[in-house]
């Protein structure tokens, strides 16, 4: 096959320096698909750290880079062993097809070349809301492991916090959500969003933090019921510490929820396409 294409891509050259560049894409193989991107989302959490230069270093990190881990588009060309056909709409969780420019995460481009195993077909009726599959899969992953419980308290009512709450409601829970910004306390269905200062309960068995605030751990431990669990599901740009005595007295468990897995993506695709999980009202 060995066809090559070019694309316009958003490139972060360095912190706080962004350009639109023409980039040569990797050659297309028999197991790849070429996707013309229709919509791509911007993460105001993780990708803001990339923009500001505050993203902690991890493998694959570096500049220049193409951001974007939540894109939707139509297949322009499909490799003979890809299992897809031109014209199919797919979700693309990023791409690494830009040569020396790092694909972290690689979806903010007019066209991408990506292994077919990385994409997933989406129902065209979802439209641009399908870019939320990555965040929805992240939300699903928080409580997908064996023995995990749906949250009683969620910290933060951004898009990820709302999706975690919606999934909890589907599972029969009615979580409380703490949100310090009064403008973000709207839009709750089946759960309550409050100012943390107004919370009278203060003892929760399962707490999920998606605020990204590395200084909150002691506060969360003070609100934990004995034997309870705190799940860190945000991304933190500073070290996290806590006072040991109160964690000891509560026999606290602290867990990190990392990146979603393919089974999480499939689960939220089924929930969204069946209409059980609403993705409405989340894109700003």
Task: Describe each region flagged by the PLM.
Residues 171-189:
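NAD(P)-binding Rossmann-fold cofactor-contacting core
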Residues 161-162:
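N-terminal Rossmann-fold NAD(P) dinucleotide-binding loop
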Residues 90-155, 165:
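NAD(P)H dinucleotide-binding glycine-rich loop of Rossmann-like/cofactor-binding domains
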Residues 26-42, 54-96, 125:
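Glycine-rich beta-strand-centered segment in the early N-terminal region that forms part
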Residues 185, 189-253:
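Glycine-rich cofactor phosphate-binding loops and adjacent beta1-alpha1 units
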